[in-house]
């Protein structure tokens, strides 16, 4: 059984026990989180498609870790002008462990 959830305009395919990496959520480690925007559910041979979401399905998860991604470098460059600008960025993330899919 798996489901596709919608979180801040991004879709994630989840199963029970899977750890997904989301953008930063301002909650403490160990807190329970409930996702209510489920757009697809597949159970055994049956599939349920939301129009736009499934109202009676939700997913329970547990905040397991906060962190920052690996640093990426952004470089702007203009040829023959002695212009070069570098910048770095590290995105914050939250790991969520999926406990159960309730339907």
Curated annotation (Swiss-Prot):
One of its GO terms (molecular function) is structural constituent of ribosome. Pfam families: Ribosomal_L21p (PF00829). Keywords: Ribonucleoprotein, Ribosomal protein, RNA-binding, rRNA-binding. GO terms for cellular component: cytoplasm; ribonucleoprotein complex; ribosome. It comes from the Bacteria. GO terms for biological process: translation. InterPro entries: bL21-like, bL21-like_sf, Ribosomal_bL21, Ribosomal_bL21_CS. SUPFAM superfamilies: L21p-like. The keyword Cell wall biogenesis/degradation does not apply. Part of the 50S ribosomal subunit. Contacts protein L20. Belongs to the bacterial ribosomal protein bL21 family. HAMAP family: Ribosomal_bL21. This protein binds to 23S rRNA in the presence of protein L20. This is Large ribosomal subunit protein bL21. It comes from Buchnera aphidicola subsp. Cinara cedri (strain Cc). The lineage of its organism: Bacteria, Pseudomonadati, Pseudomonadota, Gammaproteobacteria, Enterobacterales. The gene is rplU.
């Amino acid at each position: 059984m798996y489901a596709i959830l919608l979180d801040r305009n991004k879709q994630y395919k989840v199963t029970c026990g899977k750890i997904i990496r989301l953008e930063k959520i301002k909650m403490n480690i160990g807190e329970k989180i409930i996702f209510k925007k489920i757009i697809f559910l597949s159970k055994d041979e049956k599939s349920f498609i939301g129009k736009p979401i499934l109202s009676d399905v939700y997913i329970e998860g547990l905040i397991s870790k906060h962190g920052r991604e690996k640093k990426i470098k952004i470089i702007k460059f203009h040829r023959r002008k002695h212009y070069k600008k570098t910048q770095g960025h590290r995105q914050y993330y939250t790991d969520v462990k999926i406990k159960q899919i309730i339907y």
